[in-house]
From Swiss-Prot:
InterPro entries: Annexin, Annexin_repeat, Annexin_repeat_CS, Annexin_sf. The gene is AnxB9. GO terms for biological process: endosome transport via multivesicular body sorting pathway; maintenance of cell polarity; wing disc dorsal/ventral pattern formation. One of its GO terms (cellular component) is endomembrane system. PROSITE patterns: ANNEXIN_1, ANNEXIN_2. Belongs to the annexin family. Annexin repeats lie at residues 21-92, 93-164, 176-248, 252-323. Pfam families: Annexin (PF00191). The keyword Repeat applies. Keywords: Annexin, Calcium, Calcium/phospholipid-binding, Repeat. This is Annexin B9. Gene3D superfamilies: Annexin. A pair of annexin repeats may form one binding site for calcium and phospholipid.
Length: 324
């Protein structure tokens, strides 16, 4: 399953398939790194962070053939903590990885609503539906039912709408429809006492990104206000964050991810799970574009932020994935 099926636009990754590539040789290096006293973490990083996911899976197959052992099991027994988390993330195909991340966000202590928003708001229809299938196969319950059971109110309705994966993905703009939708959004929010959340939900969830950009332009022409400011005034909490994420992704998904990375490292502490998820999942898609946007917006390279903020072993893996 190719990344192009999830993101059908030309993007710049930072991780490319290794060439030349010998999975048997790589398996031998990993075996040596984990055999005997101690573990050679650097050798593990140099192999797994410099191969594409398809190659990593070929290495795992060669490892089992050569040594009669499961590579994932050996990695789990040798590694620990967040370093184990990032290495296992590298060994997980994208649909399963996102399914696991969603399950963790739903079933952990409290609900990680920002992770749910980030994943569901940035995937194509195909991506959402594929991940929903893997989720049900892996956990025995539908993604929709788990979201319903763990969220409430307007945010629950937003999640249920998103997980249907029914956004219009046709190209082209209908200007008359954009004007009508802009008026409907205004009437549902700033133009009345109280807010009709369902109108915002319906329009933001179903219209194509190209159409939404025209709607936002027409909204500003109509009201004199940016749609993001209107959402901030009319909503609060998780549903506000969800609607804003849709708007930001519509304007620039690259900028949205660069902002998420910055927020994961800014202030006290590091949101390691967010940092790992974005770096690993985007490394073979568009991390090259994201790191350029990060540099332009924050005046400092993504690599330098990671080096200063992340723990040593995790930081080395993530910097390796981020480097060209």
């Amino acid at each position: 399953m190719s990344s192009a099926e999830y993101y059908p636009f030309k993007c710049t990754p930072t991780v490319y398939p290794a060439d030349p590539f010998d999975p048997v040789e790589d398996a031998a290096i990993l075996r040596k790194a984990m055999k005997g006293f101690g573990t050679d973490e650097k050798a593990i990083i140099e192999i797994l962070a410099r191969r594409g996911i398809v190659q990593r899976l070929e290495i795992a197959e060669a490892f089992k053939t050569s040594y009669g052992k499961d590579l994932i099991s050996d990695l789990k027994s040798e590694l620990g903590g967040k370093f184990e988390d990032v290495i296992l993330a590298l060994m997980t195909p994208l649909p399963q990885f996102y399914a696991q991340e969603l399950h963790d966000a739903i079933s952990g202590l409290g609900t990680d609503e920002e992770a749910i928003i980030e994943i569901l708001c940035t995937l194509s229809n195909y991506g959402i539906k594929t991940i929903a299938q893997f989720y049900e196969q892996s956990f025995g319950k539908s993604l929709e039912s788990d979201l319903k059971g763990d969220t409430s109110g307007h945010f629950k309705r937003l999640c249920v709408s998103l997980v249907q994966g029914n956004r219009d993905e046709n190209q082209g703009v209908d200007e008359a429809a954009a004007i009508a939708d802009a008026q409907a959004l205004h009437d549902a929010g700033e133009g009345q006492w109280g807010t009709d959340e369902s109108t915002f939900n319906s329009i933001l969830i179903t219209r194509s990104y190209q159409q939404l950009r025209q709607i936002f332009l027409e909204y500003e022409n109509l009201s004199g206000n940016d749609i993001e400011k209107a959402i901030k005034r009319e909503f609060s909490g998780s549903v506000e964050k969800g609607f804003l994420a849709i708007v930001k992704c519509c304007k620039s998904k690259i900028d949205y991810f660069s902002e998420r990375l910055h927020d994961s490292m800014a202030g006290m502490g590091t949101k390691d799970k967010t940092l790992i998820r974005i770096i690993v999942s985007r490394s073979e898609i568009d991390l090259g574009d994201i790191k350029e946007a990060f540099q332009n917006k924050y005046g400092k390279s993504l690599e330098s932020w990671i080096k200063e903020d992340a723990e040593t072993d995790i930081g080395y893996v993530l910097v390796t994935l981020t480097a060209w």
